[in-house]
Amino acid sequence: MAVGIFGLIPSSSPDELRKILQALSTKWGDVVEDFESLEVKPMKGAMTNEVFMVSWPRKETNLRCRKLLVRVYGEGVELFFNRDDEIRTFEYVARHGHGPTLLGRFAGGRVEEFIHARTLSATDLRDPNISALVASKLRRFHSIHIPGDRIMLIWDRMRTWVGQAKNLCSNEHSTEFGLDDIEDEINLLEQEVNNEQEIGFCHNDLQYGNIMIDEETNAITIIDYEYASYNPIAYDIANHFCEMAADYHSNTPHILDYTLYPGEEERRRFICNYLTSSGEEAREEDIEQLLDDIEKYTLASHLFWGLWGIISGYVNKIEFDYIEYSRQRFKQYWLRKPKLLSFFPS
C-alpha cells in the first residue's frame, strides 16, 4: 500500500515540498499527478539528517517508477557548517560529474537526484577491488577546483567546535573530555604535521555510507559534502581509514572496533592505488611520507569527530549514542598519540 509523502516525511514546509514535486511533475511529464500514490522509504544509517527514498509511479504502468531522494536536515547542524556553502558545493560538484543533481530546496531540507547504485557496506571497504576503485575516485575528487581560497579549515573548525562544546555540555562532560585542554592538543598537533604537504578539496567524511557503486559499471560516486573543504589529502585518507572501524548499521552503531583499522599492507595498497590512478608511477619516498602523514592525521580525525559527537549529543535528536561515540574517539586519540608523535607529552 502506498504511503502519503507528506504524512511520512517530517517537514516544516510541506507546501514548499509540494511545489518542488509539482515542478518536477511538470518537467518530467510522465509521472502520475496524485502525490498520495508516491511511496516513501526511510533510509537507515544517517547520523545527521533523515533521508527518504521516494518512488514515483509513472503514467505508463509498464515503466519503472522514477526515484528521488528527500533529505531533511537534522537539528543543530548549523553549528557544524554553513548550509548555503554546502549547497553551493553540492551544485558545483554535481556540475563536474561527481554526484547527484539538486532538484529543489525547501526550508529544512532538499530534494536530490536518486543515484541508481548501491551504497557500500562496512565490509565493502575491506574488498581490495572496491578499495582500489574508491582510492582512484578519491584522487579525482581531491583535484576538484572549488572557486575561492585554498585554505584548509580543519584546525580552525576544531577550535570553533571546542568553544561550542564548552557552551553546550555539562560540567561533568566538560571535565570527562578535558575540554579545557583540547585546544592545546589541537595546537600541538597542528605544529607536528605542519610540513609541506598536498592540499586538495577533501570530503572529510568518507565513511562507507557516503560511497556508492554501480555494480554494472563499477563506477564509484562519493556523496554528501556537508563537511567538505580544502584540507591536506593525508587527513582525508586518514579519516577514511578510521571509518573502517565503524558499522553504522549494526545493533550498536556507536561502537567502534579499532581492531578493524587497516594494517600497513592494506594502507600501502590504498595509497599506491591512489597515487597511480592518474597514470603516474608512485615513488617509494612519496608512499612512505604519505603513510607517515596519514597515521598522524588519524589523531586529528579522532579529535574532530570526538568534538562533533559531544555537540551532536546535545543538539541532535537522531537515535544515536553520540556521547559514547565521542568517548571512543577520544580514547583512541590518547592511546595512539604517544606512539605517533615525536615530542608530545603523553
Curated annotation (Swiss-Prot):
Keyword Lipid biosynthesis: yes
Listed SUPFAM superfamilies: Protein kinase-like (PK-like)
Catalytic activity, EC: 2.7.1.32
InterPro entries in the record: Kinase-like_dom_sf (IPR011009)
Pathway: Phospholipid metabolism; phosphatidylcholine biosynthesis; phosphocholine from choline: step 1/1
Keywords: ATP-binding, Kinase, Lipid biosynthesis, Lipid metabolism, Nucleotide-binding, Phospholipid biosynthesis, Phospholipid metabolism, Transferase
Binding residues for ATP: 71, 207, 224
Origin: domain of life: Eukaryota
Induction section of the entry: By wounding, and salt and osmotic stresses.
Catalytic activity: choline + ATP = phosphocholine + ADP + H(+)
Molecular function as annotated in GO: ATP binding; choline kinase activity
Keyword Lipid metabolism: yes
Annotated family: Belongs to the choline/ethanolamine kinase family.
Function of the protein: Involved in phospholipid biosynthesis. Catalyzes the first step in phosphatidylcholine biosynthesis.
Protein name: Probable choline kinase 3
Provenance organism: Arabidopsis thaliana
